[in-house]
């Protein structure tokens, strides 16, 4: 059913594969690299299997990865979240970076050894680009479905992404040990929605290990080996990169053709820069230097450069002197950020150190865009672009966890398009750059805002509430599909991206008591009546707090803003007026009364002339202070206001 609707679902943005910053061979047996390389050399290319695990978030991908690593002897039994290497992943229980690991499997049916390469991919839609980059090195994928929840929105999206890249799909029903598991229903969904044969489905419990051993022969039998030529010149696809404080930049590559060894001279097709390979090896699950990589393998190499900008994801690496006979690989589609925030150091003195930390983290997450900006209120900072609001939140958390850096993050904004009367267009990602009212009246034809096609699956009991939620967020209904076998319904709405990033998923979870799932695709731009909202303190705009929004939201938001900001501004020696303004019209106002200083405290009661003179002087002083508008606002006030 859904396979036939493929033309309506556009594959999502594209991105990366592994993080593993700081991993090394330290602590491993000295003989391990030689042992692994000897085993690899004994296995021909036709017995390689590169595969990933894709599913909706929380359907058990990382747990299943742990069990496969145990069965193949990579880790000891009982290991948890082996491939979730980031602290934020372990804390949140989600996969943020796609992680890789090589495994050896001995097939008892034939007595043959196989080299398996596993990629554990993220499930959340903000990290879909991690999934698509992972697919570039894979011949197939395990499509994982939770037996208790069935097919969810991101299951559908992941299926079509894999289908569009011609991957062989192996359906797996997980969590069959749960008392609420409905295995037959999940099988019906897989068969009806994806047209995958019921007899191909493997039923497992990743948590208990039940039937997981049956997956390995299924992977060997149903997923094809890599297509490449050992005798051709070396050609590798740069899939990901990260920074190691000792080695510098480390590259994760998929060796498409030929072979690369330590000491080889290689060249980048993108930059034409030449390097010598300082170290090369596989992930097992940490870095293990094996001395070389051959056709079909996914591993790492250390090119010996320190500048993170030299590592372009999707680049083709080849041997020096063989450039003319080596075809450049197509690479990946460039990332398009969907959410932008202003980021400023909590302590202005930390700007330089924080800039270095951000540059290193961006190396490991190339979907983040970065440019410098300056705020009158918050000082020097950056305008950062992300794939979604969760992506922005995780980036901030990683910066704090991995580098100890503290940031002030402004409200997220989305890229708006301004079309002028002469036909030219500009994209505005910073509210400060939004055109003023005089231009709007004379030179601007229209404003356009980005929309997404939101795909939601939910129980039919909550349909009315979700439709109301979508209508309240200016959604445009496109399609309702009733999934008869499950009592579920699938909704498709076009929703403004600005509303999606304003915790739409949290609101959806709230009205459905956690039973809804959400996925979304870019749906282009639509004309819209949008305006810039500013917060003014004594008539001066606070640039860091400005936002662009639909005109219908302005009155409600204006009242919320002034009421909230008043809580965090301390009283001054003169009156402080807080206003919210949009389209040159003040929509809301709050006043903080002046804090009176008793200048007469030390005077004698009978000294009337001196009394009058001091009161007049105080009045003139307050008038001068008010005209300057020098209101002192603590950094904590901005942080508290920007906090949800």
Curated annotation (Swiss-Prot):
Q: Which N-terminal stretch is annotated as signal sequence? A: none
Instruction: Name the Gene Ontology biological process terms.
Output: positive regulation of translation; translation
Q: Where in the cell is it found?
A: Mitochondrion inner membrane
One Pfam match, given by its short name, reads LepA_C
Q: Which SUPFAM superfamilies match?
A: EF-G C-terminal domain-like, P-loop containing nucleoside triphosphate hydrolases, Translation proteins
Any GO MF annotation of the entry = GTPase activity
Q: How does it sit in the membrane?
A: Peripheral membrane protein
Indicate where this protein is primarily found.
mitochondrion
**Entry binding sites for GTP:** 55-62, 120-124, 174-177
Q: Could you point out where the transit peptide sits in the sequence?
A: 1-14
Q: Cite the entry's keywords alphabetically.
A: GTP-binding, Hydrolase, Membrane, Mitochondrion, Mitochondrion inner membrane, Nucleotide-binding, Protein biosynthesis, Transit peptide
Q: What does this protein do?
A: Promotes mitochondrial protein synthesis. May act as a fidelity factor of the translation reaction, by catalyzing a one-codon backward translocation of tRNAs on improperly translocated ribosomes. Binds to mitochondrial ribosomes in a GTP-dependent manner.
In Swiss-Prot or TrEMBL terms, this protein is called Translation factor GUF1, mitochondrial
